[in-house]
Structure formats: C-alpha cells, structure tokens
C-alpha cells in the first residue's frame, strides 16, 4: 500500500486518471474534481486525511449536503463522484478497503424534462432575423438542437467533417 500523500497531489493524479483512463469530458472531470474538493474541505475541517475516511465520515458528509439544501439529484451525483474517487484509490493501491462501498445515495425520484410545444418551437425559430449571418447561424443551431434532440454540450462538441 502506498504512503499518505498530500490530498492536492492525489487530486492531480485522479484528474489524469479521469481524462486518460476513463476518457471523461472536461466538464465531467471538472464536476468530479469540484465534488471531491467539497469532500476534502469537509475532511480538512474535521482533521481527517482522505485515506482515513470511514463510512460514518462519508454519511456525515452526505447529511451535510442535505442540510445545505442541495437537491437529492445533485447529492447523488456528488456521492457518485466520491465513490469513483475511492474506487480509484483502491485501484492505485492507496487503500485496501473502500469506505464508500456501502454509502447510499438519496432517492431522486423520476424527473421528466419540460419540453416546448411545436407551436413554441416554430415561434422561436420564426423569430430569428435571417437577414444576418448570426441569424442564419442561430436558426441552424436551434433546428439542429430540436431535430436531433441534442443537449447544448453535445451540440458544442460537434465537429465538421
């Protein structure tokens, strides 16, 4: 088992792992690192090294998220990132046991996205001034989003070929 390292050094190595081994997007990596940073701040306040964490510590952290008014879906995402981090620590032989293994996420319930009606979409597209290059670009963007059912992040990652 590897010796205790500075949490910032561990976080840097974890970032490389997420990008190279897991092939996650920059946005996802940033979200994971922000979530782990929240945990690290909690652990620092409690004077606990990330390698010394117990399930009780993680449950207390989870309760703090709830007390801060963070929505269950966001809590679940944060806890998922923490589980991924501790899985990484096991893989890299920093830890022998995973303290997050039995950590439960809050119930998130079924959330259906709100969608625009056909009339609303038509009104939106027709309101664009097509006499400018920007207007033509914006109409193309909206029609692509709508017709393909893309998220904005997916649209931004499209490559011309």
What are these regions (language model features)?
Residues 1-161:
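Conserved catalytic core of the tyrosine transesterase superfamily
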């Amino acid at each position: 088992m590897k010796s205790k390292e500075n949490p910032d050094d561990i976080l840097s190595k974890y970032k490389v792992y997420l990008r190279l081994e897991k092939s996650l997007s920059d946005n996802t990596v940033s979200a994971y690192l922000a979530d782990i940073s929240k945990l690290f701040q909690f652990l620092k306040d409690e004077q606990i090294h990330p390698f010394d964490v117990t399930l009780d510590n993680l449950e207390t952290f989870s309760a703090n998220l709830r007390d801060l008014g963070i929505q269950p879906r966001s809590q679940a995402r944060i806890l998922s990132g923490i589980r991924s981090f501790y899985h990484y620590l096991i893989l890299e032989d920093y830890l022998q046991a995973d303290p997050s293994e039995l950590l439960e996420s809050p119930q998130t319930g079924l959330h259906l996205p709100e969608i625009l009606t056909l009339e609303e979409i038509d009104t939106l597209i027709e309101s664009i001034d097509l006499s400018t290059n920007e207007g033509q670009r914006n109409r193309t963007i909206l029609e692509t989003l709508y017709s393909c059912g893309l998220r904005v992040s997916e649209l931004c990652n499209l490559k011309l070929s």
